[in-house]
């Protein structure tokens, strides 16, 4: 049963100090309050709390759109076979992540490679995640893993079944260049194709080079900063400067390459092509703060404004994948993160903390207007806790385990 089945109360979010919009073109907002009705943002600024059933006073803290992990290795259920961890998605919500996008359920034990098997896996994952929402999280799962046996008819059928994601890089191809027919077939059916980029990630896979990416022209260059092994510098420059490919940067990649990609993207005005993800759970581990840590790194080590970097992990991804949530905008779902500088940080507010590389403290996470976390069990304590009227106990699972 969906975790979002019960409508959220009419909620006013007040005393906002800084508003991040998730819009790469205008990453800061001016509203000091928000009104949420039926899980959606219906008013920005000037909110009268009289009719609100719940008031969340953020005490001058920052309100931002929920983060979207654009590279999260889900399989089925809130469990990762790769790291044998239960409940990781529920924990990721405490890292500000309100949506994740699957790059293919490749960690399924005994994953099939035949056409009927990979189609069945994509459909069952899509169906499962359509109604399974750990702690309210929206999981965009069911990505078809491209194999040489798949035909155009297969992709057209998959599209009728609601499959809208595909991953290239783990199929049984002798040469990745041979995947061109499947990439084009998926795209022609309206399925978004993410391609592995860089060196081989696991035994049995193979490197995807710049030549492959320029030939295949996927919709998204997955972990273009390495997953975890990066492409060479000159290749990265070509992909940024001479193509319109989406540039996905991940925590489990090469930080040096990520910094180079950001610098080039800023130089050529390609900010709208950058999105962020964690590329976890993988051998790198399970990282509830993976996206937030990536934001802190890029906001402190590049010339990108922290609000723009946050937008790369929210609204920019929503634009690429045509997601409803991801921006603080009228009519959008109220997927929100309330955060401030962590207690003891020398940064001023969440933006100041990020600018010096500190992970902000999260004091509330809302998904579709419903409070899913108050005191985050994963971030440092926020310098400014929220106050909820009437009083609301911390949702189950919020406790720190000492």
Residue ranges of each PLM-predicted region?
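His/Asp/Glu-enriched, well-ordered alpha-helical/loop segment
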Residues: 263-342
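Short, acidic/polar
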Residues: 81-89, 147-158, 204-212
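Metal-associated gating/positioning segment near the N- to mid-region
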Residues: 50, 58-123
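Divalent metal-dependent hydrolysis catalytic cores, especially in the metallo-beta-lactamase
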Residues: 88-117, 129-146, 160-173, 191-194, ...
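N-terminal metal-binding scaffold of metallo-dependent hydrolase/deaminase domains
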Residues: 1-50
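Active-site core of metal-dependent hydrolases
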Residues: 163-285, 302
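C-terminal cap of metal-dependent C-N hydrolases
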Residues: 333-387
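Residue-level marker for buried hydrophobic side chains located in beta-strands
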Residues: 12, 66-68, 193-194, 276
């Amino acid at each position: 049963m969906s975790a979002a089945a019960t409508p959220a109360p009419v909620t006013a979010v007040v005393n906002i100090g800084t508003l991040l919009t998730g819009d790469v073109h205008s990453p800061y907002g001016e509203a000091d309050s928000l009104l949420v009705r039926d899980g959606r943002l219906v008013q920005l600024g000037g909110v009268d709390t009289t009719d609100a059933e719940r008031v969340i006073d953020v005490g001058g803290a920052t309100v931002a759109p929920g983060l979207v992990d654009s590279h999260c290795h889900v399989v089925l259920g809130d469990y990762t076979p790769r790291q044998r961890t239960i409940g990781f998605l529920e924990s990721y919500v405490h890292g500000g992540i309100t949506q994740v996008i699957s790059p293919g359920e490749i960690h399924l034990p005994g994953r099939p490679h035949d056409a009927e098997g990979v189609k069945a896996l994509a459909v069952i994952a899509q169906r499962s995640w359509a109604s399974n929402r750990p702690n309210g999280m929206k999981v965009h799962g069911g990505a078809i893993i491209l194999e040489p046996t798949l035909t155009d008819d297969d992709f057209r059928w998959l599209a009728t079944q609601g499959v809208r994601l595909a991953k290239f890089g783990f199929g049984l191809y002798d040469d990745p260049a041979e995947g061109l027919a499947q990439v084009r077939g998926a795209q022609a059916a309206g399925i978004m194709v993410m391609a592995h980029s860089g060196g081989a990630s696991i035994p049995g896979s193979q490197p995807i080079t710049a030549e492959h990416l320029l030939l295949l022209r996927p919709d998204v260059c997955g972990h273009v900063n390495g997953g975890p092994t990066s492409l060479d510098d000159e290749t990265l420059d070509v992909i940024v400067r001479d193509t319109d490919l989406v540039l996905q940067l991940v925590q489990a990649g090469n930080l040096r390459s990520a910094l180079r990609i950001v610098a080039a993207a800023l130089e050529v005005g390609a900010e709208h092509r950058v999105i962020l993800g964690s590329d976890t759970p993988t051998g790198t581990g399970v990282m509830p703060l993976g996206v937030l840590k990536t934001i802190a790194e890029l906001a402190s080590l590049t010339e990108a404004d922290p609000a723009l970097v946050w937008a790369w992990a929210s609204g920019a991804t929503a634009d690429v994948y045509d997601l409803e949530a991801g921006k603080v905008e009228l009519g959008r779902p109220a997927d929100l993160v309330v955060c401030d500088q962590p207690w003891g940080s020398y940064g001023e507010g969440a933006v100041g903390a990020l600018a010096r590389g500190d992970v902000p403290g999260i004091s509330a996470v809302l998904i579709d207007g419903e409070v899913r976390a108050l005191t985050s069990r994963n971030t440092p304590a926020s310098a400014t806790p929220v106050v909820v009227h009437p009083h609301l106990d911390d949702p189950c699972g919020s406790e720190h385990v000492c």
